[in-house]
Structures are given as structure tokens and as C-alpha cells.
Regions:
Chain B
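C-terminal/domain-edge helix-coil "capping" segments
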Residues: 22-36, 121-191
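Amphipathic beta-strand/beta-sheet edge segments enriched in Tyr/Trp
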Residues: 24, 83-148
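Short beta-strand->alpha-helix linker/helix-N-cap micro-motif
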Residues: 25-89, 100
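Short loop/turn segments that connect beta-strands within beta-propeller blades
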Residues: 121, 181-185, 225-229, 269-273, ...
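A flexible loop/linker signature enriched in serine peptidases of the S9 family
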Residues: 157, 168-176, 194, 212-221, ...
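Residue-level detector of Asp-centered blade-edge/turn motifs that repeat once per structural unit
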Residues: 158-160, 204-205, 248-249, 292-293, ...
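Hydrophobic beta-strand positions that form the internal "hydrophobic ladder"
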Residues: 164, 206-209, 250-254, 294-298, ...
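Blade-level signature of beta-propeller repeat domains, shared across WD40, Kelch, NHL, RCC1
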Residues: 396-427
Length: 265, 427, 160
């Protein structure tokens, strides 16, 4: 079937979201359209026809076809553009993925309608044949989806490789800058002398300012000390944050753990 | 169907696992003792002279404590008098963290003060109050404002309304024992003598003051009622009578007698009756100070070679040594919660005020000397009142914050000012 | 039975006599010279080279009588021992460094120290009173060796 191992590597939220939605939609698709177990394997159903049935519209095939076409097109694009600037094109890839997701959601709706049509069919052989065909199509789709997943991964991996040396170092650098700026404003006068600690969570705007008031997640048990540390956060606005949106995204929500009197040696 | 469900769950879990991401954590260690920037704005309708304006009283009080730094408010137009008048961006630009605004209504019979304490960062009201009093209570109202602001921010009640006692020596061999506000205002003499007065001690119930007088050509102990002015000679035994120390319930006094021998510690009722020797030694034992729980007494003794501070348990009479740093440690006094002791220590040939954490035994020097003496804690334990002798020429009193960072003198005149005592919260 | 009560009463009286409750009133050190000045040999007090020296000086934070002052102390001790009517007061002092109360105790220790030396030479406690003024008469402006003279015991006689 589809390889579970493929799901394990993930690079960023969008790709993960995409992965999740793909699989969920697939599951739903399979759940609703495929009969996993034949209803009555040992009894044949006989339909009594008064006349020879006319050919019903086989619309259910079309969507899959479209999907196929779509995927093939993008697959070509991706393969072409890797040697160039993977960075910029990662954006395009992501945008396309978004479009795919949107299309998938539209497809899901269509699947609902198909299900209703399905129920009309009474002929078992016909349904069997349809099912068989569907299975084949599904496998084909999954295979191509696998390939696409793989190429998406290659693209994103390339992305990552370019930034690799810079990305984690940059993150640490900004974390250190933020830590330094706040630490020099911590007034521990109201925090006694014991080795206490307290935690705040903050949300930041790209300007480095607070989106909202800091949230106390763990109190020092001394409200005056909690308030003094919260003031230190306010005084430190605007916090030094990166301009690069991807890097900023990792820092826009932070958990700050304070030890106003330091820690024991 | 179950096969489907199992696979479904498995897939969802795997997907979620790859989705789950902890937010970044930053550890911030340490900090420094700083002062909270507060804008104490002139109150509307406050027509007083500069020194006695309400905001000036509050500013001086809060700055004395060492926890606050007042932002300059001179030359500001459109002074807000109410929280709704506050332009937060203006005060944020001035780096104010808190602000106090208010209004005063005064007539011949009463003064009414309404005020707000505002959090500038969060743009919200912390507290608002209205105080009414007769016109002569203006300074007291100012101190009450300081007390409440202090309590809201630090979690500890303020002491700005309390009183102090001190001895003033005039040039012509005249000594007075004076009582004044903490900031030195409203001073008056309660004892006048031609002989020295030392070791003043305000009783914990606020009603009396004990002191040592040399008027009988040797040291003797008096207890004086502060409301009536009546004084009683409670100790005039053979030899010296000195170092009175109130028990926490104000019912007893520890004291020092000599009887042709070295100074030794006794305990008696506050009226002078039923005196008992506390302990016997061949050394100097002096300067008793009760622990606030009434279970033990701290004292100075030279049994270790030089003066050090010890503690005796009143139950089993077990004696423990308390000070171990340096060769000269005298004059112990305790915080109301019994956790800290202030005393005088000699370092580098200079006598300095120190504070010791009685649990960790960590010692912090609060002053630089060279001749500091007679430290006593504020009723909230956050400040120490003491005497500074500058090269013997003058001596004055002042307060220092418990972390030693903020010293503020108390202006009560140019003469030799010594031997201070601090009233309790209620008196 | 009666004997027992008498015995108990006697024992009680004995204990009462040994009670450590001090006497409440103390005469001021400068008492009047009651029974006249006979046998006090005032001329000797006023002329003798050693007896005219009334101050013993001490090192910082110290209370032992230094060797150079032993002769003076001994001379006064002999005088007191020889004149049972003489009453002396030893008034201890300290310089202004340090706490008032500790200086009071230090001054006291110095005067007791002088008294102890006198006791060795036969002067009895009943003729000597020790008091202290601590730093209360010291020069509050002294610098360095100027403060030396504040660390002393003054010997005075009630008769003077």
C-alpha cells in the first residue's frame, strides 16, 4: 500500500499539514467509497431487470483523472527547477501544495455525491467491477502521490540543505539576544534570596513587540516577584527578532524560564 | 471495520507526532537589584509649599525605601489628575513603569485626597483611594498613600507613617530625647537632661520608651509613658544599670547590671519588680535583644576573646554563638519575623552596619563606616535605622535598605544625633 | 513537732539571708565623708608621687592593667588597705569607637580589673566601688593616638 516510512520525515508545518490532509482524505475516500469486506460473500444478489440497463455516467473516474493530470504537470515542474534556486521555488512549491489541498477538499465534496450515486447501483457484479477499477486507480494514484511526495521531499530537503549551516545557528543567536536583553532588565529586589523560578509565555509581533500581555505559566509563589519579572519583559520591548519570516515563525511564541536569584552551584 | 479504525488511528498518531512541536524555551538566569521607575505627579489642587506637597512626601518616602526611583515630573504640561487623563505612550517613552495621579480638595475644616496608582505597561488601575482628614493631617495622609503603594507593589506593609526616637546633644551640655516622624518632621522633646541619655527603646506595644540616663552620676534605667510623659525609675541597683530590652509582649525588660563585677544580663518585669539573673559568666555579657518569638535572647559577649554575638534559649539556657566573621561584632537587633539580625561589625578597622541571614548565616555589610553604631530594624524589616559618626565631628541618623543599596539621612538638625529607636506599626 | 517548726523557720531565715535579690537603693558614688577624716592621711594622698596619679590607661579594646601602671595601682591599693575608712571609686572609660553599651561594659571591665589588682594587695571590696561611664565622657573628635587618653580608669576618693 502506501509507505508509512514516508510519513515520518517532516520539515515544516505546511508540508506536514499537507501530508496529514492527504492521508486523512485518502482514508476518508477509502472509507466512504470502498467496501473493505464484501457484504455477503456467500450469497449472490440477483437483480430483476425489466429492461437492459443503460450505461450510467461514469463520472467518478473523471476527478481522479484530473488529479492525475494535475500531479503530472507539477511533477514536471519540480523536476525541472531543482538545479536552479531551490530557495525561491520552495515558495512556489508550497503555494502549489496549498492549491492541491484546496482541490482535495473540493474532491472530498464530490466524493460525497458519488457515494450517493453508488447506493443506487444494485448490481453486484457491476459494483465489484467498479470497485476493482477503483482499487486499481487508487493504487495508481497512490503510486504517483508517493512519487510526488518524494519529489516534494527532495525539494524541501534541498531547501533545508541551503539553509542548514545558517538556520540553527541563527535561531540560537536570536535566542541569546533576547535572553541578554531581558536579563539585564530583571530587577530581583522583590524576589527575596531563595533559588526560586517562574515561567512566562509571550507572543511576539514581527516588530519585536508583544502581541499581548505575557502569560504567567508558573508562579514563583511571590506575586511581587512575578510582577517585577513581568515588568522586565515589558521594559525589554521591542525584543530583537529576525526579519526572515521563517526564522521569526520559530520565535514568535516563546517560553521564558526565569531564575531571578540564579541557580545553586 | 476494526481493521480500518486501527489503521486510521495509527496513521493519525504518526502524522500528529510529526506535527507536534514544542515552542522555543529561553532560560533567563539572575537579575540585579534595581529600582522601579515611578512617576509621582503633582496632585491637582495641591497648593502647598514645594516641600510639603503630597507628591513630594510620597516621592521622598518611596525613594527612601530603595525600591523606587521617582521620574522627574517638573515642567510637564497637562498633568493628568485621573487615570483617564494618562497618555500612556508619553510615560512609556519616559520609561515609567508605574504612575500616581491625584486630586486634593482643601478647606478650613478638612482635606480630601483622591488618588490612583496606575500600571503604565498594562494601562490599568492597580488601586484607587480617597483619604479625608483635618488640615493638620496632610503629611500623615501623604504617608498613608506611600504605605499603600508600597504594599501593593512589594507585598509588605509600608512604615512611612511610623515615628522614631533619638538623642540630641547640644553644645552646652544639654541632652534631649526627641520623637519625630520617620522623615524628621514634627519633632518634639520628651526628656531634657544635663547628662547623657543612651540606649533608647520604644516598647513593642507602642506606649512607652525605655532609656538609660546618667543623671544620677551613673547609668540608671527609666521607663517613660509617651502619652502622659510620666517616667518611672525601674533600675537603680548598685553599679551600672543599662541596656534595657523589651520582651515582645512589652511585659518584661532584659537589662545589664554590674555589682562590682563585669556586666551581666538580668530579666525583670517592666515595672522593675521581680528581677532574676539570666546567666552567670566571668565575662562581659551585654546588649540583650529578644527574639520576636520570645523564646531566646541574643546578646554580646567577649567570652570568645573579643566581642561576638550569642543566643541563649530561655527554656534550656543553651548558648549558641551567632557571629563568626571578624573580631568585633556587637549590638544585635532582630527583624519582626526573626529571620534577619542587624549588628555592627568591624571590617578593615571600620565599624559598619551588617545584616545576617540567621538561617544561612550569610552576612552582608550594609554601610561603609567608619564609625556606624546602634542599628535597629524598621517594623517591616526592610530598612535599618542607625547612627553615623563622621570622624567624630558630627553624628547623624539615617536609614539604609536591607540590601545596603540605598542610604538616606534623616534631617533633624545639625547637632550630635545618636541612639535612635523605631516605633512599632501602631503606637 | 515544735522543734521541726523552729528548724524550718531557722532554715528559711538562712535562705532569706542568702537570697540573690539585690538591694534596691544604691548610694551615689560620691557619698558624704561620714565619720570624719581621721586616719585618712589626706596629706599623703595629695603629695605622694604615686598616689597623686589617678588615671590608669589601657590599650584599645583591652582591660588588663599594663606593667607601667602596676606601681600606681599598688600604691593606691596599699593606701586603701592601710586606711579602713577610705572609700574609693573606680570609674572606667572607653574611647568613642564602638557601641555605647559595649563601651560601658568595657569601661566597667577596666575598673574591675584595677579593683582585682587592688584586692591582691589587700584592699577590700567593701571600700571600693566600680562604675563605668563608657564613652560618654570621651572626646568624640579624637583622631588616632588622641583617643588613647579616653581609655582609662579614674581613681577617686569619696572624701575629696
Amino acid at each position: 500500500m502506501f509507505r508509512i516510512a514516508d510519513l515520518e520525515s517532516s520539515i515544516d508545518t505546511q508540508s506536514n499539514l499537507f501530508t496529514l490532509i492527504i492521508h486523512l482524505s485518502l482514508i476518508l475516500f477509502m472509507a466512504f467509497t470502498i467496501q473493505w469486506k464484501p457484504k455477503n460473500p456467500y450469497f449472490a444478489e440477483v437483480e430483476l431487470w425489466e429492461a437492459i440497463p443503460t450505461k450510467t455516467a461514469e463520472n467518478q473516474m473523471t476527478p481522479i483523472k484530473e488529479l492525475d493530470v494535475e500531479k503530472q504537470v507539477t511533477k514536471k515542474e519540480i523536476v525541472k527547477e531543482i538545479p536552479k534556486q531551490a530557495d525561491v521555488d520552495a515558495e512556489i512549491i508550497l503555494k502549489k501544495k496549498k492549491e492541491k489541498i484546496k482541490k482535495l477538499q473540493e474532491e472530498l465534496l464530490k466524493q460525497e455525491q458519488i457515494k450517493q450515486l453508488q447506493e443506487r447501483l444494485l448490481n453486484e457484479e457491476k459494483s465489484k467491477r467498479i470497485e476493482k477499477e477503483k482499487l486499481e486507480k487508487l493504487q495508481e494514484m497512490l503510486r504517483s502521490e508517493e512519487v510526488n511526495q518524494k519529489s516534494d521531499r527532495i525539494a524541501i530537503q534541498a531547501d533545508k540543505d541551503v539553509e542548514a549551516g545558517v538556520n540553527s545557528g541563527e535561531l540560537d543567536k536570536y535566542k541569546a539576544l533576547i535572553q541578554q536583553k531581558i536579563q539585564q532588565n530583571v530587577n530581583n529586589n522583590l524576589c527575596g534570596t531563595d533559588y526560586i523560578s517562574l515561567d512566562f509565555e509571550i507572543k511576539l509581533l514581527p516588530s519585536g513587540e508583544l502581541l499581548s500581555d505575557p502569560v504567567l505559566k508558573k508562579s514563583s509563589k511571590n506575586p511581587s516577584c512575578d510582577e517585577a519579572v513581568e515588568r522586565a519583559i515589558f521594559i525589554s520591548e521591542p525584543l530583537p527578532v529576525p526579519t526572515d519570516p521563517k526564522l521569526f515563525a520559530k520565535l514568535k511564541q516563546l517560553r521564558l524560564k526565569f531564575y531571578p536569584n540564579g541557580q545553586p552551584e | 471495520m476494526t481493521q480500518l479504525i486501527k489503521t486510521l488511528i495509527f496513521i493519525i498518531l504518526i502524522s500528529l507526532h510529526s506535527l507536534a512541536k514544542a515552542i522555543e524555551v529561553i532560560d533567563i538566569l539572575g537579575g540585579k537589584a534595581g529600582e522601579i521607575a515611578i512617576a509621582v505627579l503633582p496632585f491637582e489642587g495641591d497648593g502647598s509649599e514645594k516641600d510639603i506637597k503630597f507628591n513630594e512626601i510620597v516621592k521622598a518616602d518611596l525613594e527612601r525605601s530603595g525600591f523606587f526611583r521617582a521620574i522627574k515630573t517638573d515642567g510637564i504640561n497637562n498633568i493628568p489628575k485621573d487615570i483617564k487623563d494618562i497618555d500612556y505612550s508619553y510615560w512609556t517613552a519616559l520609561k515609567a513603569e508605574l504612575a500616581i495621579v491625584g486630586k486634593v480638595e482643601k478647606n478650613d475644616t478638612q482635606v480630601k485626597v483622591t488618588w490612583d496608582l496606575v500600571d503604565i505597561f498594562k494601562q490599568k488601575l492597580i488601586t484607587t483611594m480617597e483619604y479625608v482628614g483635618n488640615p493638620s493631617q496632610g503629611r500623615l495622609i501623604g504617608h498613608r498613600i506611600s504605605n499603600l503603594v508600597y504594599e501593593k507593589v512589594t507585598g509588605t506593609p509600608g512604615v512611612f507613617h511610623t515615628k522614631i526616637g533619638y538623642v540630641k546633644k547640644f553644645d552646652d551640655k544639654k541632652y534631649t530625647l526627641n520623637i519625630s516622624d520617620l522623615d524628621g518632621f514634627n519633632a518634639k522633646a520628651v526628656v531634657t537632661s544635663t547628662q547623657p541619655i543612651i540606649s533608647t527603646r520604644w516598647s513593642p506595644d507602642g506606649k512607652k520608651i525605655a532609656y538609660v540616663s546618667f543623671e544620677k552620676k551613673k547609668p540608671v534605667i527609666f521607663v517613660q509613658d509617651l502619652s502622659t510623659g510620666e517616667r518611672k525609675l525601674v533600675a537603680n541597683f548598685k553599679g551600672n544599670n543599662s541596656a534595657p530590652a523589651w520582651s515582645p509582649d512589652s511585659k518584661q525588660l532584659a537589662l545589664v547590671l554590674t555589682y562590682n563585677e563585669f556586666s551581666q544580663i538580668y530579666v525583670m518585669n517592666a515595672d522593675g519588680s521581680d528581677i532574676k539573673r539570666l546567666m552567670r559568666s566571668r565575662y562581659i555579657d551585654t546588649e540583650p535583644a529578644w527574639a520576636p518569638d520570645g523564646q531566646s535572647i541574643y546578646f554580646t559577649s567577649d567570652r570568645g576573646g573579643g566581642p561576638q554575638i550569642y543566643n541563649i534559649n530561655l527554656d534550656d539556657k543553651e548558648i549558641k554563638r551567632i557571629t563568626f566573621e571578624g573580631k568585633y561584632n556587637v549590638s544585635p537587633r532582630l527583624t519582626p519575623d526573626g529571620k534577619f539580625m542587624t549588628f555592627i561589625t568591624q571590617e578593615g578597622g571600620k565599624l559598619k552596619v551588617a545584616a545576617q541571614n540567621l538561617k544561612s548565616n550569610q552576612v552582608l555589610k550594609l554601610t561603609k563606616g567608619p564609625n556606624d553604631e546602634s542599628p535597629v530594624f524598621a517594623p517591616n524589616g526592610h530598612m535599618v535605622l542607625f547612627t553615623l559618626k563622621n570622624s567624630g565631628n558630627t553624628s547623624k541618623i539615617g536609614t539604609v535598605s536591607l540590601n545596603g543599596f540605598k542610604f538616606v539621612p534623616i534631617e533633624v538638625g545639625a547637632n550630635l544625633i545618636q541612639e535612635p529607636t523605631w516605633s512599632p506599626f501602631d503606637f | 513537732m515544735k522543734k521541726k517548726i523552729l528548724l524550718t523557720a531557722l532554715v528559711a531565715l538562712l535562705f532569706a539571708g542568702c537570697s540573690s535579690t539585690p538591694i534596691n537603693d544604691a548610694p551615689a558614688p560620691s557619698a558624704a565623708a561620714g565619720s570624719g577624716n581621721e586616719g585618712l592621711d589626706l596629706d599623703l594622698l595629695r603629695s605622694d608621687s604615686l598616689l597623686t596619679q589617678r588615671s590608669i590607661y589601657f590599650d584599645f579594646n583591652k582591660y588588663e592593667v599594663k606593667a607601667e601602671y602596676q606601681d600606681i595601682v599598688n600604691a593606691h591599693a596599699k593606701y586603701i588597705a592601710d586606711h579602713p575608712n577610705a572609700k574609693a571609686t573606680l570609674k572606667g572609660h572607653a574611647d568613642y569607637h564602638g557601641s555605647h553599651e559595649y563601651n560601658l561594659a568595657l569601661g566597667q571591665k577596666r575598673s574591675v580589673s584595677v579593683k582585682d589588682v587592688m584586692n591582691l594587695k589587700g584592699a577590700s571590696d567593701s571600700q571600693i566601688e566600680t562604675v563605668s561611664f563608657g564613652e560618654e565622657e570621651a572626646n568624640q573628635n579624637c583622631q588616632g593616638s588622641q583617643c588613647d587618653k579616653d581609655r582609662r580608669v579614674d581613681i577617686s576618693y569619696d572624701v575629696e
